[in-house]
Amino acid sequence: MDGARDWLLERTKRPALRLLHATPAGEALLVRLYLEAERHAERAAPWEPMLANAPRWLAAWLDRHRAEERRHAELFAGRLRALTAETDEADDAGDARSGFDAVSRRKLAALHRLVVAAAPAFGAGALVPALAIAWRMEEMGVRVFARHVDVLACDRPDAPLLPVLQVVLADERRHARACRRSVERLVNDRERPALAALVERIDRIERRLGVLGALLLLTSGGLLWMRAKLRRTATRRIAASPR
């Protein structure tokens, strides 16, 4: 079942990326979603208070991680300004964004419940599930950005967004490795089966909501492309009509 779901995600998201890059509004939607994700990562997740008792080595790494997420947000904000000319963010993609926001809220709520439920299974408490979620979300980010880099490198190698994504992808790969090392450092041998079960539950939440997000991407890309085409057709007709 998971293999079929992964196949569907891949077959849906690549065409969605191509459709979204067919219009400036579509690319702006993608960049805005990335920007919001990076800003969320910079502020840390809703379970940040549970990390208040993190050991010094972990707190220092979290500070560095947050600084890099802030840099990613600045890169995406710069690209968004170039696309939108710093106009109001309310545009044709607004309805699509609200759909993605709803998916994100559902995912965050499910993950927050998981942190609370899993914490008693580990000597380090909520630190372990919170960092395990960070690890798996970073791994998801690596897949998202790697897919996008691959699509642009093949279809639009001169796209201004490509070097931005390449920088972010390199950092996300490093973040994923660091998160995994941090989690493994916090658990003992007896807790490793519980950690494996926790990771499977995290991945299950991501897979379940990932299909919905992919379909929203594809639908939004198609709608924005159709809207842009209709506008171009209307403009040509107006220009060709007798004065």
Model-derived segments and spans:
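Non-heme di-metal
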Residues: 1-243
